[in-house]
Amino acid sequence: INGTSKQLGKNEQQTTSALTAALPLILGAMKNNTTNKTGATGLLGALDNQQHDGSILDNLGSILGGSSIDDKILADGDGILGHVFNGKQQNVAHAVSAKSGLDMSSAMNILKVAAPIVMGFLGKEKRQKNIQDSNGIGDLLGGLLGGSAKNEQSMIEKILDADGDGSVIDDIIGMASGSKKK
C-alpha cells in the first residue's frame, strides 16, 4: 500500500481506508448484479476471461507497492467499474472519497486498481471451486460478504466487520455513507 500511496501522493492511512471502503462496495454491487440472470451470466463470462484468471494476485505486492499500476490495469478497472456499477461509478467514488478523505480522482483510481484484483480473486475461486452457474457465483459472493448460511465469518467478512458485531452490511453502509455506527 505504501507504493500506491506514494503514487497517488496520499498517506497510507487514506489509501488503506479507501481500499477498505472500495472492496466491499465492488463485491456488494457484483452480488446485487447476480440477482438477475443477465447480470450473473455476464459476470460468469467475464470471469472466464483469461485476464481474470487470478494471475494478477501473483503481482499484488508490486501493484499495491505502486510499481505495477500501469494504464492496462487502470483501463481494465475502469471497464469493470462501468459494468459493475452500471455507469454510476462517480457515486461510488464519492462514497470512497467521503470514507477515506481522498479526493475524487484518487478515490476513483483506488476503485480502478481494486476492481481487477477483485475480478482476479473471483476468477481464481470460480476455477478452483468449478462454479458454472449463477447460483454458484451468487453463493461465492454471498460467502465473501457474509451472506452464506455458515455460522463462522469468512476471512473477508472478519476483515470488513469493522465494529466486530458479526454484521458486515452495517459496516458497508457506513463505509458508503462515510459515517460510523454508534
Protein language model regions, located:
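A structural "flexibility-hinge" signal
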Residues: I1-K182
